[in-house]
């Protein structure tokens, strides 16, 4: 039986529609209504967001990528953006998000794709790629991870994890007050004045009430800090399968990233993917797309051109 879901409209305002003028599209995946945009033609580039963002995070990527002759697909994960938002935690799991993404991309018959993976879009997109290698051409990995995390390391990096897991504080701050989409994102960009003036209300407005914000504080509970965690086996699988993969891979890092610092996490990814290029560094904290979106898009274009052999 389908669970109840919250629905959302695009936050009003000229800035949103100027920066995100794309036709909204929807597919039914695993009983949920999933939103995405599909622009341009050519080999597809799939841009994947995490928590608490939505496709709007990639607004500075679409034009540079389509201008280079690429098809750009930007889904909103179930629970975010314009996709349906299940109001029960049981509807959410990493395996479920991988299955939802798989359902969408198979319906679109996506092949030869480049998966651009950020935050929870990392384990989700990598889960798709490793399960569907015949549909994937290359990987772009930034500010994410794909293995179980030691508790001490994770707590040191992401203090709010403790709030998210507290029985009352997480729902109160992140659910009732939308703290992750507001203050959390604000603290995770470099140019905070621009973000506050232009974009912060867009991320807050797409999650308008506590029911719509469920995933902002429940999804982090799937981060595997020990072998009893719900997502531990899936992250073990990701780590193991990445070692076997041969996808051309570009690593991108924000110089100021406080969540997944490029030295620690790029080193780990290069241990798993010794053929990976990078890390290519840009101005940015965790949400590096906000500060350096167009620059990252051009790095992706250059990386894919090198794969094609069209540029040195």
Name what the model sees in each region:
Residues 2-25, 32-36, 57, 80-116, ...:
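Flexible "cap/lid" subdomain of the alpha/beta-hydrolase fold that forms the substrate-access gate
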Residues 37-82:
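Conserved HGGG/HGGXW glycine-rich cap/lid loop of the alpha/beta-hydrolase fold
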Residues 44, 54, 180, 212, ...:
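Short phosphate-engaging motifs
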Residues 48, 252, 284-285:
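Short hydrophobic "strand-cap" motifs at the C-terminus of beta-strands
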Residues 52, 266-267, 297:
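Short amphipathic alpha-helical segment that frequently serves as the phosphate-/nucleotide-binding helix
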Residues 275-312:
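Catalytic active-site module of serine/aspartate enzymes centered on a nucleophile-bearing elbow/loop
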